[in-house]
Swiss-Prot record:
Assembly and interaction partners: The complex is composed of two ATP-binding proteins (PstB), two transmembrane proteins (PstC and PstA) and a solute-binding protein (PstS).
General function of this protein: Part of the binding-protein-dependent transport system for phosphate; probably responsible for the translocation of the substrate across the membrane.
Membrane-spanning residues: 36-56, 83-103, 127-147, 149-169, 209-229, 274-294
One record GO biological process: phosphate ion transmembrane transport
GO cellular component, one term: plasma membrane
Name of the protein described by the UniProt record: Phosphate transport system permease protein PstA 2
Induction profile: Transcription slightly induced by phosphate starvation, part of the pstB3-pstS2-pstC1-pstA2 operon.
Source organism (scientific name): Mycobacterium tuberculosis (strain ATCC 25618 / H37Rv)
Keywords: Cell membrane, Membrane, Phosphate transport, Transmembrane, Transmembrane helix, Transport
Membrane topology: Multi-pass membrane protein
Gene: pstA2
Location in the cell: Cell membrane
GO molecular function: phosphate transmembrane transporter activity
InterPro entries noted in UniProt: MetI-like (IPR000515), MetI-like_sf (IPR035906), Phosphate_PstA (IPR005672), Phosphate_transprt_permease (IPR051408)
Amino acid sequence: MGESAESGSRQLPAMSPPRRSVAYRRKIVDALWWAACVCCLAVVITPTLWMLIGVVSRAVPVFHWSVLVQDSQGNGGGLRNAIIGTAVLAIGVILVGGTVSVLTGIYLSEFATGKTRSILRGAYEVLSGIPSIVLGYVGYLALVVYFDWGFSLAAGVLVLSVMSIPYIAKATESALAQVPTSYREAAEALGLPAGWALRKIVLKTAMPGIVTGMLVALALAIGETAPLLYTAGWSNSPPTGQLTDSPVGYLTYPIWTFYNQPSKSAQDLSYDAALLLIVFLLLLIFIGRLINWLSRRRWDV
């Protein structure tokens, strides 16, 4: 019995796989996972780089500074009216959509409870899933036709603001949720008014995240074409300041319209507009990243 037990114990190590084979299989699995990750990353990055290279290589040779100082004239001219119109639309979205969205996010994070919070969250999640062209058509029927605003700055700003509400509200709610609970508890323990603590402590801490979400939502809104075709129309002149019955130019219109024209000057202007829009969107994203970096650096210090 002793010999059989001893021989069995000697055979046990032979039943376990060699360590080298286990390590080798792990390396193979890791390599396959890394290869899959690289392939997925390439699927996302390659079309983006291809688009950027195509636009830049086509726009830079034909770009001239007169595009920035001349208004559109038919299918030619410059893009000053579109640049100013895009900037005015962006400011309007920040003022209207940003205000409503931030207040919505604050209410959901700090005051709403139970069923009310669930209903509001469900509402803006549904809103985020509605195609932009549908929002544009609804805006056309409601604002342009029913309220008789005509193609105008106000109609375009309002539709883009509605589009941006889900993204900014979600970003605001997430930024407020990341504020440590100890900040609120300390303010309450010191007897500070709830409104004062919210403005001076909670919102101040969450502001970088709110601003970043607002800039990302603004970049998404400004890159839209269909909602503005239905609401803002198009104008060869810069905005006059009139809110209704005054069409507005914007950079996505020449990209969509001039590209299909047989004239080479119109196609060149389309690529110039695409280049300017890409620069504008990248600038917004860069500002958002810079705000995040400065915020983290401040808290690390």
